[in-house]
Amino acid sequence: MKNALINATTKKFEIIEKTVLPITWGLYWHNKFETWKYDAYDEKNVFCFGSGVLPVIGGHRLIFSFRSPLWDGFYFSSMGGAGYQFKSTGLNNVAIIGRCENPSILVIENDGQLRIDFIEVKEELKTVYEVSKYILELYKDKNLRSVVVGEAAKRTNMGGLFSQTVRNGKFVEGSEDWAARGGGGSVLYRAHNIMGIVFFGDEKEDKEEKEKAKKIIESYYKKPMSKVVLEHTKKYRYDEETKTGGTFGNNWLLYKEKVPIFNWRMPYIDKEDRKKILEKILKFYLEIFNKETIEPKRWANCGEPCPVLCKKYRNKNKVDYEPYASNGTLLGIFDLYEADRVVKTADALGFDAIEIGNLTAWVFELLDVGLLKEEELNIKKPIFDYKKITNDDDEEIREISKHNAEQAIKFMHNLAENSNDLYKILSLGKRKAAKILNERFKSRVNKIGKKFNDFAVYVPFGDWGEIAPNLYWTPGFFMPFVIQGRYLTYYKPEFNEPEKLAELVVESIKLELPIENLGICRFHRKWLKPVLKELVKELLGIEDIVEDSINLYREICEYNKKIGYPAKIESERVKDLIIAMAKEFGNEEWTKKFENKENVDEYVKRVLNKYSELLGIDWRIS
């Protein structure tokens, strides 16, 4: 494998010949540069990325790793399809150190000879679409792919990385993806002064290796590979049983009345009322989505030739469950057209949709309960009364959704611009902001009897680290593991005994981390699981990819322990979510135990004890 270490200060690069997977590559450099010693925005926070290494359908993701300004530890995030173009450069992995003097675009090209250059950007580019278009105009005749940041990366900890497929000199509608979790876009811009990366070349994929992989898969399944893929990915393409497709189509039906609403207030809303709200979601979200997306087959892939076509789009909006739950139902928005506006704003500004949705929902509730004031944020209070959704007519629901959407859009613009001192604090994230605001508004805290963090939903790490959970009401996303906000957990709608949950989480890690490190789309995990070890052994020479991945997880743990340790759950809302889950899923023993709220600590402690034992790490709460 050919890899490059690029210095953005000197504009020089070094080629390193080494067989190494993308996340392993990133952690290697973070240990080498001892990045735990420095601020997340120090130029020593090496920004790494690499492409998928197995020549299989779904195997061309681009994986980014960095020390996260949010989580505070080592973090990784990935996007679909971009690795398909990146392989044409002849490189497998890249690491960036140093800092450009002025905002720049990194150019990686290979037309027979590898060239790496930087282009200074003098124009005022604010949205991810403007940066992407700027790059496209420069290299329209190339078979390119770009990865860019937006305004959010410049002044907040929540900047993501955006990429859209280009074909014949034009952007492909719906074929776009994000590596947004953890604030990688913020690191790329604020640590290295890089607004975007563009790559293109003429290196070809090894056809012999591709045939070898296909033979292994078809030998196991005794059927054509294309059929294997489609049979195991119907949720993401089209499910005949549900008559819909994609995460947006199916997750509302799967999680039903447990979908997150109103800043995760589900524990305080009667189940029957939540069912009524679900009816509104199915009417104003799912029915419209099916009519405008599923029926006319507005489906695309991420940019690699994949038949699943998981990207569902309508009205120039790519529609996925988590961005729309975060920036729709979580904000009290139940009109899909209004949610479109909010998601498009979050995307244009370059925010991690999950993180900004959770932050906005928190701020909405702070306004609703009086811990923050309208005049301090220059937005109006949201309409955050769930009974108005269960009781009101359709037109009233549209008006409520429009009002909340307008406040969310204003809030996001103000946050991206850091329009006043309060927005500067909020741009740090919920946990850091809550610590500051608890002191600043002590009298309000005393009056209400609750702290700012009591309304915030996040997983803590160390003294300052945090990440917003994925949009699933399930214990696995609230546990303070070595890394959170990824799918290295167990998230089916269940409530298990702590030791059982730990066992399920570790089993998930054994599948999810290998496919992340190999750069494979997790939508292909079902068909891939039985053949993964053989594929990796035959094509990469790695004897046991699962054991290799567990060792990697242990190394991430050791890195993160240099920064902090698992923290107890600090938020009353998160504790209430865990307590309510025990009741929701009929666990009488824990429902009784949770009558004493402090027993949430016991549950978490037991999960981490078993998790540590199974993984051979020390990640316990004392």
Curated annotation (Swiss-Prot):
Is Iron among the key words of this record?
A: yes
Record keywords, A-Z: 4Fe-4S, Iron, Iron-sulfur, Metal-binding
The entry's free-text remark on the cofactor is:
Binds 1 [4Fe-4S] cluster per subunit.
- Which Gene3D superfamilies did the record assign? Aldehyde Ferredoxin Oxidoreductase Protein, subunit A, domain 2, Aldehyde ferredoxin oxidoreductase, N-terminal domain
Pfam families according to UniProt: AFOR_C, AFOR_N
Q: Which InterPro entries is this protein grouped with?
A: Ald_Fedxn_OxRdtase_dom2, Ald_Fedxn_OxRdtase_N, Ald_Fedxn_OxRdtase_N_sf, OxRdtase_Ald_Fedxn_C, Tungsten_al_ferr_oxy-like_C, W-dependent_AOR
Which terms in the Gene Ontology molecular function aspect does this entry carry?
Answer: 4 iron, 4 sulfur cluster binding; electron transfer activity; metal ion binding; oxidoreductase activity, acting on the aldehyde or oxo group of donors, iron-sulfur protein as acceptor
Where, by residue number, does [4Fe-4S] cluster bind?
C302, C306, C310, C521
Swiss-Prot/TrEMBL cofactor(s): [4Fe-4S] cluster
Coiled-coil spans in chain:
none
Q: Which family does it belong to?
A: Belongs to the AOR/FOR family.
Recorded protein name is: Uncharacterized protein MJ1185
Native species: Methanocaldococcus jannaschii (strain ATCC 43067 / DSM 2661 / JAL-1 / JCM 10045 / NBRC 100440) (Methanococcus jannaschii)
